[in-house]
């Protein structure tokens, strides 16, 4: 069972209860999260699930705030804590041309990941796409309310990002 959509940690009571029930039934659980939550909750959830999928959107805290609505210090601190716990996790990085796929951000992200304690995590690049745009239109909701210029990264940009990570000793795959 994968818990995702919005931020599952914002529904902590239900999430904890469901993780406990799944564990009793030997059902594998994954929590897809930004880790923007109280460290005590993160520690508890990490100890109850089988895998964490953790997004890193931007290393610059001000730009992270601009694009994701929150600063990233708590997120990065929680990632470091989870890494130190030895909990299985995968770092996922959405690649968005004009937002976070630039060389500096990629180098900063790779450097951060390579500095984490414990075993080097798997890293997945998720190239931006606008598949959800049609769904938002059908539902009458706004897809990109802040009109952030978002573009799918070119193969050249994707390959450059992979090389930057590789040069930092971090293997990243493209999903």
PLM feature spans:
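Conserved AdoMet/S-adenosylmethionine-binding subsite of the radical SAM
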Residues: 2-5, 9-137
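Short aromatic/hydrophobic-glycine micro-motifs
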Residues: 27, 141, 170-171
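A structural motif corresponding to the C-terminal lobe/cap of the Radical SAM core domain
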Residues: 111, 117, 121, 136-164
């Amino acid at each position: 069972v994968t818990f995702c959509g919005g931020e599952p940690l914002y529904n902590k009571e239900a999430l904890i209860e469901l993780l406990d029930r799944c564990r009793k039934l030997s059902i594998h659980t994954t929590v897809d999260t930004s880790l923007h939550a109280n460290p005590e909750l993160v520690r508890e959830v990490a100890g109850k699930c089988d895998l964490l999928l953790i997004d890193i959107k931007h290393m610059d805290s001000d730009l992270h705030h601009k694009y994701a609505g929150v600063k990233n210090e708590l997120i990065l601190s929680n990632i470091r804590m989870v890494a130190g716990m030895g909990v299985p996790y995968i770092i996922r990085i959405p690649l968005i041309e004009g937002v976070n796929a630039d060389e500096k951000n990629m180098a900063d992200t790779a450097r951060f990941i390579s500095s984490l304690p414990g075993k080097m995590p798997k890293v997945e690049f998720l190239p931006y796409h606008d598949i959800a745009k049609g769904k938002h239109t059908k539902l009458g909701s706004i897809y990109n309310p802040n009109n952030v210029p978002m573009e799918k990264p070119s193969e050249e940009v994707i390959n450059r990002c992979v090389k930057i990570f590789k040069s930092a000793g971090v293997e990243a795959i493209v999903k």
